[in-house]
Amino acid sequence: GFIFDFCGVEVDRVTGAVRVDKYVTMHDCGRVLHPGMVAGQITGGFAQGIGAALYEEFAYSPDGAFLAGTFADYLLPTSTEVPVPVILHVETPSPFTPLGAKGVGEGNCMSTPVCLANAVADALGLDAIDLPMTPAKLAAHIHPAEQAPNRARGLS
């Protein structure tokens, strides 16, 4: 299938927290055979994308050991952190499948982090931004002068 996304975000300039005000995702998965299943697939991919964009950080020690080996250390969004996206469809049946269906559900795993990163970078006036966009990382962009003393002492 095919997909496009757009969103509006707010970045708290004190805490560095990101709030997704509105998220719209449009899918062309050919003929929609089961609307509930399609919505579930899109919503699940969207939740994974929120995690990749804002929460899930692969932390390693200086000797290369993985530090986030449990869910106590590796943050994933819960249903309270995942906003409800607006899901739109356009149906252009595939000529290559018997019922005209195409793939659906995987797209938001890839498009959501990019969409959110572009929105946050635009909100902060940045050319690029690394994922995940944790409050600490965003605070370093918002208040770089305040981060410099901590970096000098090895605290960031």
Residue ranges and their predicted role:
Residues 1-156:
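C-terminal catalytic domains of large/alpha subunits in multi-subunit enzymes
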